[in-house]
Amino acid sequence: MALQKFPLMGLLLLLTILVSVTTAVDDPVCPATSKLSRASFPNGFLFGTATAAFQVEGAINETCRGPALWDIYCRRNPERCSGDHADVAVDFFHRYKEDIQLMKNLNTDAFRLSIAWSRIFPHGRKEKGVSQAGVQFYHELIDELLKNGIVPFVTVFHWDTPQDLEDEYGGFLSQNIVKDFREYADYVFTEYGGKVKNWITFNEPWVFAHAGYDLGKKAPGRCSRYVPGCEDREGQSGKEAYLVSHNLLNAHAEAVEVFRQKVKGGKIGIAHSPAWFEPHDLKDSNDAPTVSRVLDFMLGWHLEPTTSGDYPQIMKDLLGYRLPQFTAAQKAKLKDSTDFVGLNYYTSTFSNYNEKPDPSKPSWKQDSLVSWEPKNVDHSAIGSMPLTAALPVYAKGFRKLLKYIKDKYANPEIMIMENGYGDKLGTTDSVDVGTADHNRKYYLQRHLLAMNEAICIDKVRVTGYFVWSLLDNFEWQDGYKNRFGLYYVDFKNNLTRYEKESAKYYKDFLAQGVRPSALKRDEL
């Protein structure tokens, strides 16, 4: 009755209720807990582990699987893959049922996998043949996950371009890849979309483009000869990476158009892989802007087109004609073409203003006018660097990066698609040493706490977290010498899996929680 007498007051009350409902939906709600555990996170938060087809499956001659880019790259250039290859990898193809039981043992909710393009289309295109045995393998894998109560998250492309497309037109160097990727994505969405609702089109496009076509550290190893280590290579640093990314982004947009037609109630995104940066010298006015600039080049390069429809302005300003342009139609397809931001976070470093770039030797890193420094102006390293660590450990950077994405990109939903710690054990590698991975345990503890603070204090909308990786596996140019798994794989003894200390910690964390964390905030 009162609302009839005071319509304006009633309208204001209604708006207040609507705003409150919206806020409740958008902002994460964290339970009050006395110890860090699964219970410290919002209801429905997903915890899982991650792998990628090429890194774990093996079975390269089964199901009529065609050769992939990394197969040929490692055969032709064994020294670029630490003398290793992924012909067998960790034999996930034959052992996935056993490995799914390891996931259950961890108490995880979800599992991130990728589909090998050439296991579906051995020659890259549907018209050249479909491997029904390959199609069936992924059906059986997905069904086994679902039977065990584990939600599948599927990556359409994790760096394994069919070699036939590389040979035919240069893979992602050609715009022909756009229609071929759309066809492949259409097929897997149609085939598996009824039971898989969470998808990633591309894994780490920055790494794929920069390391593969500018730095030459990953397949196909293209770079200019002035780049250290590239004296005998083919490629054009400072150009090809931008072309590859342009084609990749257009391929993503085409795939998402199909996805939204075919997969009802699904979500799709890209898994980005930025580091966090701290200014090299806080007193230098040139260093502070380097953080946002390098993040525009590293993260915004592929994220901003999927939100706004175009590249970051700073990239257009600094690169000029070397940065391809989207057409109006391409911009329209790219804009708002993700439902969440996928984030892979491992480490942080310092950013320093690069005052004297060499215009005769363009490269992605030089283009951003930023140099990366392991120590700041006071000669202090970032975070900590355990003796066998592959990368510096800096959990503060994780929280800062999450807050940065929230603030810059309008508070999107974020899924942590990879977070993990690499061990290079060298001559000390053994089952006993490898399973006593206390540094990985501490890494996970610190990063889970940092993520919890980002969610509960900074109100970042993180909804899932995947540890990289379930198993030690083939780590690209490092071969099997860099171990990231929660389970140790004995490469000398039948690929036997052994539970590591980090797996025990994660299992307890996801079960009933762990003892109250003794970590202090300044230790992060």
From Swiss-Prot:
| Assembly description | Component of the PYK10 complex, at least composed of PYK10/BGLU23, BGLU21, BGLU22, JAL22, JAL23, PBP1/JAL30, PBP2/JAL31, JAL32, JAL33, JAL34, JAL35, GLL22 and GLL23.
Extract the GO molecular function terms from the UniProt entry: beta-glucosidase activity
Reactions mediated catalytically: Hydrolysis of terminal, non-reducing beta-D-glucosyl residues with release of beta-D-glucose
Q: Which Pfam families match?
A: Glyco_hydro_1 (PF00232)
Tell me its family: Belongs to the glycosyl hydrolase 1 family.
- Subcellular location as annotated: Endoplasmic reticulum lumen
Function summary: Beta-D-glucosidase active on scopolin >> esculin >> 4-MU-glucoside > DIMBOA-glucoside. No activity with pNP-glucoside, oNP-glucoside and sinigrin as substrates.
Let me know which tissues express this protein, per UniProt: Expressed exclusively in roots.
Q: Does the keyword Oxidoreductase apply?
A: no
Instruction: Give the activity regulation note.
Output: Activated upon binding to PBP1 or PBP2.
Question: Binding positions for a beta-D-glucoside?
Answer: Q55, H158, N203, E204, Y346, E418, W468, E475, W476, F484
What PROSITE patterns does the entry give?
ER_TARGET, GLYCOSYL_HYDROL_F1_2
BP GO annotations? carbohydrate metabolic process; cellular response to cold; cellular response to phosphate starvation; cellular response to salt stress; coumarin metabolic process; response to osmotic stress
The residues forming the signal peptide are 1-24
| Keywords recorded for this protein, A-Z | Disulfide bond, Endoplasmic reticulum, Glycoprotein, Glycosidase, Hydrolase, Signal
Glycosylation annotated at which residues? N61, N494
Q: Does the keyword Glycoprotein apply?
A: yes
The intrachain disulfides are C223-C230
Domain of life per record: Eukaryota
The name this protein goes by in its record: Beta-glucosidase 21
Q: Which PANTHER family match?
A: BETA-GLUCOSIDASE 21-RELATED, GLYCOSYL HYDROLASE
Concerning InterPro entries, the annotation shows: Glyco_hydro_1, Glyco_hydro_1_N_CS, Glycoside_hydrolase_SF
Q: Recorded E.C. number(s)?
A: 3.2.1.21
The GO cellular component terms are: endoplasmic reticulum; endoplasmic reticulum lumen; mitochondrion; plant-type vacuole; plasmodesma
Active site per database record: E204 (proton donor), E418 (nucleophile)
**Motif Prevents secretion from ER: residue span?**
521-524
